[in-house]
Amino acid sequence: MNTTNKQLTEELNNTESNNDHNDFAENNIINLKQLKRKLPEELQVQAEELKIENISSLLKQELVFAILKKSVEQGGLIVGDGVLEVLPDGFGFLRSPEVNYLAGPDDIYISPSQIRRFGLRTGDTVEGQIRAPKAGERYFALLKVNRVNFDDPVNAYHRVHFDNLTPLYPDEKLGLELENNSKDSKDFSTRVIELVAPMGKGQRALIVAPPRTGKTVLLQNIAHAITTNNPEVFLIVLLIDERPEEVTDMQRSVRGEVVSSTFDEPASRHVQLAEMVIEKAKRLVEHKKDVVILVDAITRLARAYNTVVPSSGKVLTGGVDANALQRPKRFFGAARNIENGGSLTIIGTALIETGSRMDEVIFEEFKGTGNSEIVLDRKIADKRIYPAIDITRSGTRKEDLLVDKIILNKMWVLRRIIDPMGSSEAIEFLLKKLENTKTNYEFFEMMKSPERSRNGL
């Protein structure tokens, strides 16, 4: 093991000393990630400055490739990163989240020897120096590995495999509460979730949602709360079979990685994207990082797997193949809190009351697999009350591990008060009380003693 460490360290030192000979100016260093984030109009201006021909006929990825190639010819140094996809032949490519991990001309080639040397696997986020393609080559190639999963490459070789890590119940709270600083603020969704179904790092949560109940907006609010209150968490929003305009809206409103496969793309593409995202998350958890994946929707992902999986000859009610749900269950089941550091949280939406028997079967299969459930109610949404959360049917298992005992007792008192009410009256009652306070702590302070609270807050 020590010999391997020595070899890896020597390899890194050698490549670093080689780089010292490349005395490039700061403005000659091109960051591939920053280049991919630019708008097509900005790339066209940069291409014109480099005197690249036929700019208007090039797609964005082709434009990035042309700019990189021209910059290298003029003495530039390229630094790039991406998520590794290892192909059956042994070599791999770094795919970019900016293009939803689609294969493209600007992908970075990694040789089988580099993959073996650093113990790389599909899903690893690799960063390093790259070179332009030589004569007869089609892709940029990785010259030097600087970091693996935002960590030293040597550590990647000795990490414990995800499947060998010990899963535990979530015991560290994932703060979702956003303070209401003004009386005009009407969004109390994350505060309601904190009261009825608190989330922890490593939670496997299901948002059960009929159509038009505000599930996408709820996910946006959760994403915003996570990035605001938990900056150490790596957030990925996975949109499967969604409308393109909703993808754009999510990208503009969420400060995190948003990847998508829209409804006009084939089922195989939905599956490939989901596999890349879950593998990336697993690799980060192996490095003791906290990852949160928001999935919209798990039902559509299960439909995609049902289309892609080879037919077993056994078909369940609604046209679901008997083997089709095994892989989406493995995706959802990957969420866990890890002993000695690291966690993977998955919050996914499950569609119900769509009129499709298949969706009902998928939901029934996933029901009970999560350890937290938020149920949205169509009747509440029809009254234009948001969030349309059915408080009595929503909850978290082992919530005593996440919440202070005094607060937990007050949460139970609140449930006893709300229980006799209908779902609409319950959420209206709670929202009215939350409007008068900035935080949930203030709300609990307003509550009377448990004995007197049974008659109302």
UniProtKB/Swiss-Prot annotation:
Gene3D superfamilies: 1.10.720.10, Nucleic acid-binding proteins, P-loop containing nucleotide triphosphate hydrolases. Residues 1-23 are annotated as: Disordered. One of its GO terms (biological process) is DNA-templated transcription termination. Pfam families: ATP-synt_ab (PF00006), Rho_N (PF07498), Rho_RNA_bind (PF07497). Its EC number is 3.6.4.-. Residues 77-152 form the Rho RNA-BD domain. InterPro entries: AAA+_ATPase, ATPase_F1/V1/A1_a/bsu_nucl-bd, CSD, NA-bd_OB-fold, P-loop_NTPase, Rho-like_N, Rho_factor_ATP-bd, Rho_N_sf. Disulfide bonds: none annotated. SUPFAM superfamilies: Nucleic acid-binding proteins (SSF50249), P-loop containing nucleoside triphosphate hydrolases (SSF52540), Rho N-terminal domain-like (SSF68912). Keywords: ATP-binding, Helicase, Hydrolase, Nucleotide-binding, RNA-binding, Transcription, Transcription regulation, Transcription termination. One of its GO terms (cellular component) is cytosol. One of its GO terms (molecular function) is ATP hydrolysis activity. It comes from the Bacteria. ATP binds at residues 200-205, 212-217, 243. Facilitates transcription termination by a mechanism that involves Rho binding to the nascent RNA, activation of Rho's RNA-dependent ATPase activity, and release of the mRNA from the DNA template. Homohexamer. The homohexamer assembles into an open ring structure. NCBIfam families: PRK09376.1, rho. PANTHER family: TRANSCRIPTION TERMINATION FACTOR RHO (PTHR46425:SF1). This is Transcription termination factor Rho. The gene is rho.
